[in-house]
């Protein structure tokens, strides 16, 4: 049940989220793994979750008709959002907005096949009052088994 050193799913997700558009992180993502990246900005946390879920489904990272996959992704997204928002998922209610890059990675980080597939969600960007220049950097990571 050892975590494979070359299969650190959270690290891969973080590197993808941290990479600028013109950067290509040097990653050797296993061929049978799936991933997607994107951007989302909103004062509404529901829109942030929906954008990431839509990206994962449209890029075939998760299957649209399998509830447990959507459920696992949801929990990984929420865990990553907790990191970005310091445990307070509220955005608009407390006059906060986010501008985030995200990466979603699905794969098998453990040696044993019985450990199954996992999903990692990494978020990187800014959070702050909806006034330009009043935001600061934030980062979050969520990992969940499928």
Curated annotation (Swiss-Prot):
GO terms for molecular function: mRNA binding. Keywords: Activator, Histidine metabolism, RNA-binding, Transcription, Transcription regulation. The lineage of its organism: Bacteria, Bacillati, Bacillota, Bacilli, Bacillales. GO terms for biological process: L-histidine metabolic process; positive regulation of gene expression. Belongs to the HutP family. Signal peptide: none annotated. It comes from Bacillus cereus (strain ZK / E33L). This is Hut operon positive regulatory protein. SUPFAM superfamilies: Hut operon positive regulatory protein HutP (SSF111064). It comes from the Bacteria. The keyword RNA-binding applies. Homohexamer. Antiterminator that binds to cis-acting regulatory sequences on the mRNA in the presence of histidine, thereby suppressing transcription termination and activating the hut operon for histidine utilization. It holds the Pfam family HutP. HAMAP family: HutP.
